[in-house]
Amino acid sequence: MEQVVIVDAIRTPMGRSKGGAFRNVRAEDLSAHLMRSLLARNPSLTAATLDDIYWGCVQQTLEQGFNIARNAALLAEIPHSVPAVTVNRLCGSSMQALHDAARMIMTGDAQVCLVGGVEHMGHVPMSHGVDFHPGLSRNVAKAAGMMGLTAEMLSRLHGISREMQDQFAARSHARAWAATQSGAFKTEIIPTGGHDADGVLKQFNYDEVIRPETTVEALSTLRPAFDPVSGTVTAGTSSALSDGAAAMLVMSESRARELGLKPRARIRSMAVVGCDPSIMGYGPVPASKLALKKAGLSASDIDVFEMNEAFAAQILPCIKDLGLMEQIDEKINLNGGAIALGHPLGCSGARISTTLINLMERKDAQFGLATMCIGLGQGIATVFERV
């Protein structure tokens, strides 16, 4: 079986969904920009030799509809002979895209794939056109389709206090801002055209969603966003709404050698699981455990974790049940996470994997694990190993 390696991994800055940098930029353009950028950064690879493009996107309608992967590839002037497919596993879409491409390469059905994902939550809101089947309520609690309420449920089941959530959210912003100031994100962010507050076209090379002024004290004044009577989850402890894309160049280790490209990491294992939709945010726990089992590793072997921060109330129970509460500041989301950077749904799997690989290089780490919860009760995880 072929070894699958990541040769390159990049992303756009994360733009605010409400009147942000990408308010006049379409999702296809964000995607095409990264496709072009990956090819430009790796000139020994010709676009015509790509076997396939796998692109995650959740709300596949309006500008994100009709197979956005193919639309973006055409905009990027990738040869017509290269196919492209859009993948949807809700929040895990672009990580699923990575898994799909990896399996094709492992089996020898492909050698080189472009992988990534996008979500423009300013142009195509998360709830746009969603119409749940009324019969679902026979089998699943109605609140299971309301992500904030599932986070409230997790916090109650696991004893996660409002103060713990506020502290974690403040940490996310502080870490993301520190990474921005130190230049840690420069290795992954590709400058991307957008418009400033005055409507002037400019190149953005930083995430505009981070709020460096965030404090625990300020967060403690916010009202519950989903359960106004007895809730603890606020807008400040939820992932920000943002627009963005991320992309990875994935290939067999043998093809990378042929092209003279240095692999940055290899995929050690992959896993996806289902869980109770009412606690959908718990998915990373069984997914991570399964991925670790497949890799022949334990949580203690992992040097760095990237866990998508859908909600502080959601990620803290996962950290707790993976036995990592004492190692948060040494191993988990060292450059902040989605509470600070946002969670553009179809982008996030590739985004956290990109950030993880950069962190692994900076820390000279051997193993890293990226994982995320998925709406309606799923979890997905990938174990990476430095080459």
UniProtKB/Swiss-Prot annotation:
A matching Pfam family: Thiolase_C
Superkingdom: Bacteria
Keywords for the protein's UniProt record, in alphabetical order: Acyltransferase, Cytoplasm, Fatty acid metabolism, Lipid degradation, Lipid metabolism, Transferase
Chemical reaction(s) catalysed: an acyl-CoA + acetyl-CoA = a 3-oxoacyl-CoA + CoA
GO cellular component term, pick one: cytoplasm
Cell cycle recorded as keyword: no
Cellular localisation: Cytoplasm
Chief place where the protein resides: cytoplasm
Molecular functions per Gene Ontology: acetyl-CoA C-acyltransferase activity
Entries under CDD domains matching the protein: thiolase (cd00751)
Gene Ontology biological process terms, A to Z: fatty acid beta-oxidation; phenylacetate catabolic process
UniProt xrefs under InterPro entries: FadA (IPR012805), Thiolase (IPR002155), Thiolase-like (IPR016039), Thiolase-like_sf_Thiolase (IPR050215), Thiolase_acyl_enz_int_AS (IPR020615), Thiolase_AS (IPR020610), Thiolase_C (IPR020617), Thiolase_CS (IPR020613)
Active-site residues, record numbering mapped to chain: C91, H343, C373
EC identifiers of the protein: 2.3.1.16
Pathway connected to this protein: Lipid metabolism; fatty acid beta-oxidation
Annotated PANTHER family: 3-KETOACYL-COA THIOLASE FADA, 3-KETOACYL-COA THIOLASE, PEROXISOMAL
Assembly behavior: Heterotetramer of two alpha chains (FadB) and two beta chains (FadA).
Family classification: Belongs to the thiolase-like superfamily. Thiolase family.
Biological role: Catalyzes the final step of fatty acid oxidation in which acetyl-CoA is released and the CoA ester of a fatty acid two carbons shorter is formed. Involved in the aerobic and anaerobic degradation of long-chain fatty acids.
Protein name listed in UniProt: 3-ketoacyl-CoA thiolase
Organism whose genome encodes this protein: Salmonella typhimurium (strain LT2 / SGSC1412 / ATCC 700720)
